[in-house]
A protein has these predicted regions:
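Helicase-primase coupling helices
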Residues: 282-364
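Short helix-loop-beta junction
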Residues: 86-96, 145, 267-278, 347-351
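Glycine-rich phosphate-binding loops that contact phosphosugars or nucleotide phosphates
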Residues: 59-225, 405
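Structural beta-sheet core signal
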Residues: 70, 123-125, 161, 250, ...
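Extended, charge-enriched "interface" segments that sit outside catalytic cores
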Residues: 1-59, 323-327, 343
Length: 409
């Protein structure tokens, strides 16, 4: 059952002239005719031994620690963090998942070490090459700290490496030290890695049902109706871009979707921001950010359109007590939040702001699998419509090289 629905009535943009080209590209995607498109059919192709291996390793890690530190940056950790936050964190009795290697702040890492000092810890380092600066620094610091805490032999038993199957400095170290390892498939780029071991292994440790997560993606990957929904969203995004919109503001009225927004920013920013093109992805938590950005959204320079992620059903709620006053007492807080969605959209429609609403039926593993796959597909199609390669990110090497120059590398 498809649990992602899209409403384009508010976009008020015609895009039928691009339909045929987008359909042709989607057909190429489904036939895996482009480089780095292994992610398209991957949910149906994941080897059963990989799934079993991740589950066994997750059981082992759970028996050893109460904190699993995921070391990675960008797509190497954001998928894990986004899914876990949306689900409310680790399941009872499972280790808390913490994140390092996503910045180069000495203060952050020093403080991080103090936070976990008295905990039982395992590491999961996610890096295809092992050479990414942020991850390399954090891994070296935390590994040395674990040597002092556990000794070298025991530390090796507490490290899981997700990396290239044959090459790279992390693969060499993992082979030498005897770490448990999982592969990052060579034809899947990091920004499309939501269903690879780098994301799914930490989720398994946290008690997430990774089979159900993958099944959500697997069902819609083979569903023509789903691909049409993705096509509609991609075409609408491109048409709004062509009409002069420069920013897509991703909005959600549930704070648990904050990291889904961050994941989208990385996905869209690196897929589309090339050759002077692309939509700039921003994200807002509403109603919170209405008290800082609401004025701009309503009456500011209209270089943006809005995409609203709306969770229809949540499994927890609060009834407003009598003390709140007769106009609110007895109401469901989730119902009031739903009225806020409608009210804000009505106000923004009067201001002629283009809006796209994506309804997410409920927030569980199955639906999240559908949502992440849906967003990856629309990013690929929109990028292709813009005339850029949606599967590379050459510009990120420029700043990395400048940093290496300053470090004398």
């Amino acid at each position: 059952m498809i649990k992602i629905n899209i409403s384009l009535e508010e976009s008020r943009v015609k895009y039928s002239d691009r339909h045929d080209g987008a359909v042709a590209f989607m057909q190429q995607l489904r036939r895996d005719e482009e480089d780095f498109t292994g992610w398209v059919n991957w949910p149906s192709e994941i080897p059963s031994e990989w799934m079993d291996g991740m589950k066994r390793a997750a059981d082992d890690v759970r028996s050893k620690c109460d904190k699993l530190i995921v070391i990675g940056i960008g797509g190497s950790y954001l998928g894990t963090a986004a899914v876990l936050e949306a689900l409310g964190g680790s399941k009872p009795g499972c280790p808390e998942i913490l994140y390092a290697g996503n910045n180069m702040s000495g203060y952050y890492l020093a403080d991080f070490k103090e936070v976990v000092e008295n905990n039982e810890v395992c590491l999961c380092v996610v890096s295809k090459s092992g050479g990414t600066m942020e991850s390399r620094l954090a891994f070296s610091v935390l590994k040395d700290w674990m040597y002092e805490k556990y000794g070298r032999e025991e530390t090796a038993k507490r490290i899981v490496a997700v990396t290239d199957p044959v090459k790279g400095i992390l693969r060499e170290e993992a082979n030498h030290e005897g770490y448990v390892t999982f592969e990052i498939p060579g034809n899947i780029g990091g920004r499309y890695s939501a269903f690879t071991p780098g994301i799914m292994f930490p989720l398994a440790v946290a008690g997430v049902d990774i089979e159900t997560f993958v099944n959500g993606a697997k069902e819609i990957a083979s569903d023509d109706a789903f691909w049409q929904k993705g096509l509609d969203y991609a075409l609408a995004r491109f048409a709004l871009y062509e009409s002069g919109k420069e920013i897509e503001v991703i909005e959600y009225y549930d704070p648990s979707l904050r990291l889904i927004g961050e994941w989208c920013k990385q996905l869209y920013g690196e897929r589309e921001g090339k050759e002077g093109k692309g939509l700039f992805p921003a994200s807002l938590t509403l109603s919170t950010d209405l008290h800082s950005m609401g004025q701009f959204l309503q009456e500011g320079h209209q270089i943006f359109f809005e995409t609203i992620f709306n969770v229809v059903n949540r499994d927890k709620d609060v009834t407003v007590p009598e003390s709140a006053g007769p106009d609110l007492a007895g109401r469901s807080l989730n119902d009031i939040n739903a009225m806020a969605v409608k009210g804000v959209m009505a106000a923004h429609a009067k201001a002629n702001i283009p809006m796209i609403k994506i309804d997410i039926e409920e927030m569980d593993e199955y639906t999240l699998g559908q949502l992440l796959y849906f967003l990856m597909m629309t990013a690929a199609v929109t990028g292709k419509l813009m005339g850029i390669d949606p599967f590379n990110q050459p510009g990120v090497e420029d700043y990395k090289q400048e940093i290496r120059n300053l470090l004398g590398q």
